[in-house]
A protein has these predicted regions:
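Functional beta-strand-loop-alpha-helix junction segments that form "active/interaction loops"
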Residues: 1-25
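Terminal, contiguous helix-loop blocks that mediate binding/assembly
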Residues: 14, 21, 25-28, 40-42, ...
Length: 187
């Protein structure tokens, strides 16, 4: 046991920042990646609460995505990757929010089936820290669900690999399109 904590909510931004700070301080490595698994709602207004990640216990014990970004920013470390094993964390809004706290994001733009990510198939690639290996992580996810589907299950999934440094460019280009078509969009 490296450190024990009193009972607390893991979706509290101060708790998350402290645990990550402790983890980084105790580690001899200089590069870090994160895996988060839970429930999430992205920016969907039809899901309550909108812009939420995680659920600690029952009820509304969730963390708003902007608070999660703030918690990760507080550790003053840019992560090599964040893998979100949670629904809706691959949307553009979420990717833009996390653009300054990690280099790459691996996630699903839709629901993540109960099977989740097939960790045993891709852990050997995840911590190598290059885009080609992150692509292999995504391919293992695709292969896993293709295999389930071919076995007659109704399993399906989506996965995305997002290069965070491209998010500002995407936002800039999207803004140009919105301005250019504002009259059409108003209707």
């Amino acid at each position: 046991i490296v450190k024990e904590y009193d009972t607390q909510y893991s979706v509290d931004k101060d708790v998350m920042s402290q645990v990550l700070t402790d983890m980084i301080a105790k580690s001899s490595t200089t590069k870090f990646g994160l895996i988060f698994g839970s429930h999430a709602s992205s920016w969907l207004n039809s899901i309550y609460p909108s812009r939420a990640f995680g659920q600690d216990g029952n009820g509304d014990n969730t963390m708003l995505i902007p608070d999660m970004v703030e918690a990760l920013s507080a550790v003053n470390k840019k992560f090599e990757f964040i893998l979100f094993d949670a629904c809706y964390m691959g949307t553009t809004e979420v990717a833009y929010a996390f653009r300054n706290v990690c280099n790459y994001q691996l996630s699903s733009v839709m629901e993540v089936p109960a099977y989740g990510f097939p960790y045993e198939d891709f852990m050997k690639y995840l911590y190598k820290g290059n885009v080609d290996d992150y692509k292999k992580v995504c391919q293992s996810y695709i292969d896993f669900y293709k295999s389930l589907y071919s076995e007659g299950t109704s399993a399906w999934a989506t996965v995305s690999l997002i290069d965070s440094k491209e998010m500002d460019y995407l936002a800039s280009e999207l803004k140009k399109e919105i301005v250019a078509h504002k009259n059409v969009l108003a209707n």
